[in-house]
């Protein structure tokens, strides 16, 4: 009996060591994943449910973060007619904070489609709602695939980003009849070489939405994708207006 217990103890200890090693490797290799799992471990404090920021922020900066989150949530909720996701937000108002949690030069990023990190340059409703849209879309897709250009173009549309969309009418600032990047790796390469890739993607999505019932049409499209219909069967690029 004692020998059997010893074997179980050794096995349990080995599992504990392996799990600890996995946590350490994740924290070193993927700090953003670790930070979104344990914001407090990276020096962030909870400002409100689901929102974390640097400790000791003055009241006006805390209020700024809260207002940005509220406005961004409203944009996503209004577009989709509700929410199916509730990502944690890690908000940094200093570059040191953003580097510490694994951020780079981006304004913001959705981490594993379950959390959002915002850099000091991304603490505004446009960037926050852009990243929240990625999380919301994938929560509604239930594992269905969409081209990365659609994912990004929809995020621009929902966030109403004036850098890449006109305010009214045919909202395209930059049309492109060329194929757009399909995979995430292709998108990252293309967008780093051409920042206007976002405008090209947003043009396609906004024109499709304009020709297919707007927000309701997009919600219907996402529902059909979630039900298993392939993307090429439900999304047909509209012609440019005459």
Regions found by a protein language model. Give the residues of each.
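Beta/coil-rich, acidic/histidine-enriched accessory regions frequently appended to metallopeptidases
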Residues: 1-35, 41-44, 52-56, 67-71, ...
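Sequence contexts marking disulfide-bonded cysteines in secreted/extracellular proteins
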Residues: 37-42, 93-98, 171-173
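Acidic/histidine-rich, surface-exposed loop or edge segments in extracytoplasmic proteins
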Residues: 44-62, 113-115
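Structural motif
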Residues: 57, 93, 119-121
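Auxiliary, metal-adjacent structural segments of Zn-dependent hydrolase domains
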Residues: 61-113
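Short pre-active-site segment immediately N-terminal to the catalytic Zn-binding motif
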Residues: 112-129, 140-146
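Acidic/His/Gly-enriched intrinsically disordered linker/tail segments
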Residues: 127, 141-242
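Short active-site segment of divalent metal-dependent hydrolases/proteases
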Residues: 133, 137
């Amino acid at each position: 009996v004692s020998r059997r217990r010893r074997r179980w103890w050794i096995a349990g200890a080995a599992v504990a060591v392996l799990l600890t090693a996995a946590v350490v490797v994740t924290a070193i290799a993927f700090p953003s994943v670790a930070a979104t799992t344990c914001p407090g471990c990276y020096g962030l404090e909870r400002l409100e449910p689901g929102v974390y920021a640097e400790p000791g922020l003055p009241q006006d900066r805390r209020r700024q973060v809260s207002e940005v989150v509220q406005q961004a949530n409203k944009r996503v909720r209004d577009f989709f007619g509700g929410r199916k996701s509730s990502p944690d937000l890690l908000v940094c108002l200093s570059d040191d904070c953003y580097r510490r949690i694994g951020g780079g030069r981006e304004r913001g990023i959705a981490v594993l489609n379950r959390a959002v990190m915002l850099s000091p340059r991304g603490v505004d409703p446009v960037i926050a709602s852009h990243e929240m849209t990625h999380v919301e879309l994938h929560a509604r897709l239930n594992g269905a695939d969409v081209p990365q250009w659609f994912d990004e173009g929809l995020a621009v549309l929902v966030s109403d980003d004036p850098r890449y969309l006109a305010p009214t009418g045919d909202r395209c600032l930059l049309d492109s009849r060329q194929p757009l990047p399909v995979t995430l790796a292709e998108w990252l390469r293309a967008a780093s070489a051409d920042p206007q890739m976002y405008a090209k993607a947003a043009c396609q999505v906004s024109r499709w939405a304009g020709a297919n019932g707007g927000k309701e049409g997009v919600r219907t499209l996402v529902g059909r994708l979630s039900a298993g219909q392939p993307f090429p069967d439900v999304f047909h690029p509209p012609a440019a207006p005459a």
